[in-house]
């Protein structure tokens, strides 16, 4: 039995049906009219769905999913408002999700710590320092290191002030992103902090400099790993391909194909999930 703790509270899915359809159209390079022709669903109904006015029948959702090469079971579950989420268990360390209001959903930062220690590894820093401090767990007295997944404001807005208040803390970011005082990490970089190891996965797509991070406890090799996925993989969805849709799709499928199914996924937005759950239900897995 592992000495672990996960502080879990409700977090809404990052994307509704309209968001998933819009992203899938962008990823596939399809216009609304072409999708209407391929799916035999009226263009106006597709536009209404993207604008969160849903009047699609189950059969139309199935045809849209097939035309977009989406996982129809997951797409239908999102349309019904009942996307399945797994029980989160098996981590060999403590995980603290920090949920920041962002639009109608949340942006996430995380702190990972050996449960016997008062120092933690911070992944992203949220939109600003004051919100970060309000959410900061009382058991964590000081950050041991900071890892940034990518440079959108809601993920690193609190970084500069956190460094100013805490002093000399190592900061790590993706290659290609210049952050003052930060060390850029490429594919396969490994860093050890006590019992914990952090490994870098280079995952451009949502933006060009983007990393995911795998956290493990090498002394517990059968325990579940943690994937901090930034804006690559969400519960029930994927990031928007602002930079490159082919690279985003390739990295999304790489994560789902290569990581153990027990891997807990800590995304940049929305609730925790697992690789097993997303292999089964994520609409972007076909």
How would you name each of these model-derived features?
Residues 41-56:
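Recognition helix of helix-turn-helix/homeodomain-like DNA-binding domains
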Residues 59-74:
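DNA major-groove recognition helix of helix-turn-helix/homeodomain DNA-binding modules
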